Amino acid sequence: MNVCRVIAAALVCGTAVAQVPTAPQLPEQDRVLARQIFKEFIETNSEDSDGSVTAVCLAARNQLLKAGFATADLILAGPNDRKQNLVVRYHGAPGSKLKPILIIGHVDVVEARKADWTTDPYTFVEKDGYFYGRGTQDMKDGDADVVESFIRLKREDYVPNRDITLALTADEEGGKSNGVSWLLKNRPELMQAEFVINPDGEGPTMHDGKVTSLLVEATEKTYADYRLTATNPGGHSSEPRPDNAIYELMHALLKLEATPFPVELNNVSRSELEAMAKITPPATAAAIEGVLKTPPDPTAIAAFSKDPEANATLRTTCVATMLQGGRAPNALPAEATANVNCRILPGHSQEETRKTLVGIFDDPKLTVEYVADDGTTSPTAPNRESLPPPPLLPAVFEPLKQVTGQLWPGMPIIPSMVIGASDSIYTMQAGLPSYGIGGAAIEDTGNRMHGRDERLGVESFYNSVEFFYLYLKALTK
């Protein structure tokens, strides 16, 4: 999941617009059921190493079966026993010619060591106004939101104007069996849609108990690792050579440090910055306005780029993340390697970026290889350009404005570009416009996803359930 963006912090300096509601419209039976589903999801270990995504999907399937969903509309599919994905079909109006809406939600979680936590990460604990447990923020809350909303809509005999598909999937956080990718490749008929909603997006950001903004993740950078290698004959350390592999590697990395990629705005990042300029303090707004100029003002770029997250909004970033060299303390290194991790702007390929790195290093003795997800390397990278950002569809944003206006009056909705990664990258590569939209409001200082004692505010969770119920109805009227 994407980390909290600089925009959220900037908005704190503006005016908070609404108290977080306590979901007064959420019926008591739905509060009880949502908590029950959430608890069951949290207490089911779905780590890659020793957990089971299948077990979480079976728990969801059982809840939906009890609610009256047909077995044929609850499809388990995946590459192995632990990595079965669940695809749920909520049928729309008979004869509707509208394409389905696809909702994707990963049910795997990052590893959690019990010794690091003050509570058991796989025991659902409520204390001091929070729910604790691995996945409470990322993203079993969103999974529970949508499952409970499906059940509530079914109980109300609601008929949407089109089919709604929910895919609960494996291995977003890691592992070799990413569920969204697997379904798109092996069961594409289940993943047809006009657009995709991914609840793995950020929910409303809060400051002092009041919401400040809702970021809608409308495009993503592409992830890529490259292995930079320097080699030479090596030798005994008592006879140093001028062409030391470690030195050559470090010279190349210093060039990388000194050579940022060019600034490049797309329709989403430009919209995000335009919104920021209207609501941030004057100094920040002035820097943003300079960045938005054609051509951008170099002084403004330098000022705005001082914040790492702001910098990542403007350009492709590549950074050294791992080093390895030498085999013994008294031997010259015959080889030295570095991993360079890149987050690539939409519209550029991994191979284009690899070639750019080769140009930056400008040393024919070095090799720059692409590192695939399984750790294997190749001399070239995939050369398919990532798709440009999708349009900001009124079919997505108008219902969103309607619902947020009910729950958080006056809260700005700001399209944003994910600088991390989510499963939306797979659906966007498949040509499906995808939008990350979360419903759980989290304090700007309260982000614990992937960390110890992960937690989510109790009322933030219940309000998120209500948000998705209202949003699904607004999307399909």
Residue ranges and their predicted role:
Residues K39-E47, R61-A70, E148-R155, P188-E189, ...:
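Sec-exported extracytoplasmic/periplasmic mature domains
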Residues Q19, G201-N463, Y469, L475-T476:
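Metal-dependent amide/peptide-bond hydrolase catalytic core
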Residues V20-R134, L153-R162, V340:
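Acidic/His- and Gly-rich active-site-bordering loop/insert found
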